[in-house]
């Protein structure tokens, strides 16, 4: 009835009713602010990496600077909005607004790259599922890149966050339903992601047990340490499955060793560690709270182990995508952008 009356008034008087615009844009979500802050920091860092790669004098041709440019370009492309547009910077309300580009010195660059990586992991804890996974991937890659560059440039190692924290204790008896339906193995849920990680840790423990007997003497201590890590990770993953009231998968009596294990056990271990990255990424996206915290820690630690065994760390560990599918960086216009050139 009210709609009809309004329509008659409009037709009879020729008036056009326009809703009042408050002039206040809707507030951005935490996840969107985190994305914008990550993009801003990444573009600033990319400018510094370009400057280092092109620097004359003692910093000329710094090894790894070109790789850092490539890494940060990929990160910036992944962090663009769906339309592939650069926003105006600084992003109001972003959790980590940066006033200016970091100084293009090796030491300052490593420090800022590490700081950015740590902030991305911090923001991943509270972001929505898909954005949490992207931020965890970007943060892990930036932290590990900072660590690698510090070693190559003979700088002090950046302070990195502690990984593989012990998860919450299992719930008390009676706090979980007495009977719950088994989740669909193909469904993307916290239960299925945890189950996948439990199975992967069972396999990793088995493979490392064999590896410590097959590796050369110089590699045995590292393999023995990683075996202990995977035994702890297995217990933690099982505990977290209990916390989430899921069914804990049992291990197999034995596992098929990777095809290259006989000829190159170290390369097989590198592949094994790298194969766990998407599993940790899944859990980051599909969980919350302490379970997500553990998954973020696990992603970073798995990336470090895979690199230590010789694997090439992907630009976005924990995400399975082709960088060629990402949007290209647009050429910025105006003076508000944190980066003056895209190459």
Q: Can you describe what each PLM-predicted range is?
A:
Residues 1-343:
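All-alpha RGS (Regulator of G-protein Signaling) helical domain and cognate RGS-like helical scaffolds
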């Amino acid at each position: 009835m009210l709609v009809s009356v309004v329509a008659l008034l409009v037709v009879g008087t020729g008036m056009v009713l326009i809703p009042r615009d408050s002039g206040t844009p809707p507030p951005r979500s935490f996840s969107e602010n985190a994305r914008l802050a990550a993009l801003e920091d990444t573009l600033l860092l990319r400018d510094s990496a370009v400057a280092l790669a092109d620097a004359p004098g003692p910093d000329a041709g710094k090894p790894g600077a070109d790789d850092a440019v490539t890494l940060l370009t990929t990160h910036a492309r992944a962090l663009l909005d769906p339309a592939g547009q650069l926003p105006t910077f600084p992003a109001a309300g972003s959790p980590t607004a940066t006033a200016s580009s970091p100084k293009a010195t090796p030491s300052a660059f490593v420090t800022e790259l590490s700081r950015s990586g740590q902030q991305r992991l911090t923001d991943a804890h509270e972001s929505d599922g898909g954005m949490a996974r992207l931020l965890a991937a970007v943060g892990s890659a930036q932290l590990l890149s900072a660590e690698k560059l510090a070693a190559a440039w003979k700088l002090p190692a950046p302070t990195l966050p502690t990984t593989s924290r012990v998860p919450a204790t299992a719930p008390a008896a009676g706090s979980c339903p007495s009977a719950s339906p088994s989740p669909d193995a193909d469904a993307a849920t916290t239960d299925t992601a945890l189950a996948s990680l439990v199975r992967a840790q069972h396999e990793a423990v088995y493979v490392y047990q064999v590896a410590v007997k097959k590796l050369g003497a110089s590699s045995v201590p590292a393999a023995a340490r990683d075996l202990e890590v995977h035994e702890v990770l297995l217990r933690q993953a099982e505990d977290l499955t209990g916390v989430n009231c899921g069914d804990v998968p049992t291990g197999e009596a034995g596992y098929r060793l990777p095809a290259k294990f006989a000829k190159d056990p170290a390369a097989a271990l590198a592949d094994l560690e790298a194969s766990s990255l998407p599993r940790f990424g899944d859990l980051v996206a599909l969980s919350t709270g302490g379970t997500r915290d553990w998954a973020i820690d696990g992603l970073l630690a798995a990336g470090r182990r895979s690199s230590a065994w010789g694997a090439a760390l992907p630009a976005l560990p924990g995400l399975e995508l082709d960088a060629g599918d990402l949007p290209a960086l647009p050429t910025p216009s105006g003076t508000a952008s944190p980066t003056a050139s895209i190459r």
